[in-house]
Regions:
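Conserved, well-structured core domains of diverse proteins
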Residues: 1-232, 421-426, 432, 436-440, ...
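Flexible glycine/proline-rich, aromatic-decorated loop/lid segments
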Residues: 225-232, 295-306, 316-329, 362-413
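Alpha-helix-loop-beta-strand connector modules within alpha/beta enzyme cores
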Residues: 260-267, 317-344
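Glycine-rich beta-to-alpha transition loops that act as phosphate-gripper elements at the mouths
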Residues: 276-282, 341-354
Length: 706
């Protein structure tokens, strides 16, 4: 929608404004004070200098923004190749931090306490959970990355015993489950390749709310990057451009987020669920909401975190630094008594172990590296990732010099010349050694003990322009939440029926029954994600003799209207019948199977309802679905392969002059948005704004001129 200019005010923020200016602008302002920050005098001086340039009194010079990585990437690559010591690289990075500080952490130094105990760096324990280090390889997707680079990141994480997060581009089929304990799979707005097998192939599942480099924007993979292999992993059509919506269309509130987290944990009860949020104004409150929604991990991604494929305006003007995100999230979670319930991860332009220690002091449990991992396999920071002409073979699907010559590349170096898991291994091992040295200097023998100890940092430069005293204050610890009368309150799990169905099916399969019908006449709106747990158990091999299972029919009758997520992530051999209707998220990310939502007989013998809620078949890659009634907004959004029939009929001539087009249609608006493949048959009014952003698939519309 369109707003007046002031309608966008909540999206703006500032860093380092003096209090007088900040009060007038009225935006959230970080690290400014009465005594320090941008003043009217400084603004006047800047205006006078610009005026002098404009008049020609002095020579005008166009100021280029300072860029950090282009100045050090060669040194990082040399470390990966074993041609330079980490200390030499780290010292050079520190010199540039002093010359052109481009991040808040560049204004901070690590300050050991006078009474710090002596610790040998080799005695410092870096382990977090089942992994050996508090650093991870940040999410990068297949498609944006070429196959060789993409595989290399996963192999390196396994060698290092750390986590490699996957981007939103699905997974190469031969990699599914191969790196389970070292892998995180991403569920983003496009839902590319997200299905029950995908969700059960990793120990971490990340819901991507946004990206630090471009919060509020969706992704775009050009058609020339969608090869047959990329299309297979994403469940789409080769050569067709892929567009991610700007937001997840089943997430409009914290309650919706809680529902999706619940669905993912139903699909894979063994996985930890992370929620990735860009650093924006109010990030602390957002983090508290995410924790209350049931996430295990919160990832704050700063404005330098992201991709060379982001648009220039986003790279330059959008988002906030990672330091602000992790600082506010950590403090807000402590104030709410929720900090111990979640891990806090952060990424965004990290380059050294010193960066990691600073972010941990601000509140992070783990710190992500994305660009540095790319540099370790040969990236030259040319910022042409979206062009498909990467001259070092990282973000292109061209693998040989001959192929590059045929396609007119100006230069090309095959990936294998510099890229290997050993390069990343060398760099990340050097980072961990760096972390050990700094943690030992601070007097700790466990890296997690420095988490949130911001008083171990001190501001060392730009004291007049920015006030970091709030950032480096000790954080008051809260002694848990006040005790509740009657002890801890617990309630009925929303997905308990979904789990009971699995138990019943397993019991009868054990008796040699390989085709079953589970009938339930009492399901209600609070019974959510029905069929999801069963499909996950089948995929994990937890149902005995599951390869002999012919079909499992789930029948919900007697005016049943199951709760959200009916048949979410469904696959063969499961079929679902609901007589009455269903709520939001039916059949989302289905890979196969059948879902029939039918009308039900009322006491007068008339058949009524048979409708579904919002985001029906969101991201569905397969399966056959029939809806005898109507569908709420965004039916079949981002669908890529399923077959769907909507049976709701037009019963009287349409009157567009009455307004409310969506409310009076059979499909309530935005149907088939961003669809890439699949087929749909609409027997009634398809509603307004259909097929926006659609790049493939077929929609058949019944024509009724009368």
């Amino acid at each position: 929608g369109c707003h007046e200019l002031r309608g966008y005010g909540h999206s703006f923020s500032s860093i380092g404004l003096g209090k007088a200016i900040a009060n007038i602008l009225g935006t959230p302002n970080y690290f400014g004070s009465e005594a320090r920050g941008l003043t009217w005098t400084a603004i006047l001086q800047d205006a006078e200098e610009r005026a002098a340039e404009f008049r020609g009194d002095v020579r005008a010079r166009l100021q280029n923004p300072d860029r950090f990585f282009p100045k050090v990437w060669k040194r990082a690559e040399a470390v990966a190749q074993g041609e330079l010591t980490w200390q030499e690289y780290s010292d050079e990075v520190r010199e540039w931090e002093e010359k052109i500080p481009v991040s808040i952490r560049h204004l901070l130094d690590i300050k050991p306490r006078p009474d710090a105990k002596l610790v040998d760096p080799s005695d410092v324990d870096l382990r977090v959970g089942n992994h050996d280090m508090p650093i991870i390889i940040s999410a990068m997707s297949y498609g944006s990355q070429g196959e060789l680079a993409y595989r290399t990141y996963a192999d390196a994480a396994k060698m290092l015993n750390t986590v490699c997060m996957n981007g939103e581009g699905g997974e190469l089929l031969d990699m599914l489950g191969k790196y389970k304990q070292w892998r995180g799979q991403q569920v983003a707005s496009g839902r590319f390749g997200v299905n029950i097998g995908f969700l059960n192939s990793a120990d971490f599942i990340e819901i991507k709310i946004g990206q630090g480099a471009k919060p509020g924007e969706g992704g775009h993979l050009p058609g020339f990057k969608v090869t047959e292999q990329v299309a297979a992993s994403r469940g789409t059509t080769p050569g067709v451009a892929l567009i991610s919506p700007s937001n997840n269309h089943d997430l409009y509130s914290i309650e919706d987020l809680a529902q999706l987290i619940d669905e993912l944990k139903t699909a894979n009860p063994h996985a930890k669920v992370s929620v990735k949020i860009p650093v924006v104004p109010g990030v602390g409150i957002i983090a508290v909401g995410v924790a209350k929604a049931g996430a295990d991990i919160i990832t704050c991604t700063g404005y330098t975190g992201g991709t060379g494929a982001a648009r220039a305006h986003a790279l330059r003007h959008v988002g906030l630094p990672a330091e602000i995100g992790v600082w506010l999230a950590h403090r807000s979670l402590i104030a709410s008594g929720l900090r111990d319930d979640v891990e806090l991860w952060v990424d965004g332009g990290m380059k050294t172990g010193r960066d990691v220690v600073k972010m941990m002091c601000l509140g992070a449990n783990r710190v992500g590296f994305g660009t540095l991992a790319m540099v370790a396999v040969g990236c030259t920071i040319c910022r042409g990732c979206q062009d498909g002409t990467c001259h070092v073979g990282i973000t292109t699907h061209v693998k040989t010099k001959e192929e590059a010559d045929r396609k007119g590349f100006k230069a090309f170096r095959p990936f294998e010349e510099k890229g290997s898991p050993h390069g990343i291994y060398n760099v990340f091992c050097a980072v961990t050694d760096d972390i050990r040295k700094w943690v030992a200097k601070l007097g700790y023998d466990n890296a997690q003990d420095i988490v949130g100890k911001a008083d171990l940092l001190e501001q060392i430069s730009m004291h007049d322009q920015i006030d970091l005293s709030d950032l480096t204050k000790p954080i008051p610890q809260r002694d848990g939440m006040p005790a509740q009368r009657g002890g801890l309150r617990i309630s009925r799990p929303r997905n308990i029926i979904s789990r009971q169905i699995t138990e019943e099916v397993a019991r009868y399969v054990n008796k040699g029954e390989y085709e079953l019908t589970y009938d339930d006449e009492q399901v209600m709106a609070h019974d959510r994600a029905l069929g999801t747990h069963l499909c996950g158990a089948i995929k994990r091999g937890e149902i005995p003799d599951n390869e002999r299972l012919d079909a499992v029919h789930l029948s919900f009758s007697n005016s049943a209207v199951p709760g959200n997520g009916l048949g979410a992530f469904i696959d063969e051999p499961v079929t679902i019948l609901a007589e009455g209707g269903a709520q939001d998220g039916v059949g989302k990310c289905a890979k196969g199977g059948t879902i029939n939502i039918l009308k039900v007989l009322n006491h007068n013998g008339a058949r009524l309802d048979g409708s579904v809620g919002k985001s029906f078949a969101y991201g569905a890659q397969g399966g056959f679905f029939i809806v005898q009634g109507d569908a709420d907004t965004r039916a079949c959004i981002r669908m890529s392969g399923a077959d769907v029939i909507f049976g709701g009929m037009i019963h009287e001539p349409l009157r567009d002059d009455l307004g409310g087009l969506g409310a009076r249609a059979n499909l309530k608006g935005y149907a088939f948005e961003y669809m890439t493949s699949g087929r749909a048959l609409v027997l009634g009014d398809p509603g307004p704004w259909i097929c926006a952003g659609m790049t493939g698939g077929t929609v058949y519309q019944r024509v009724q001129p009368e």
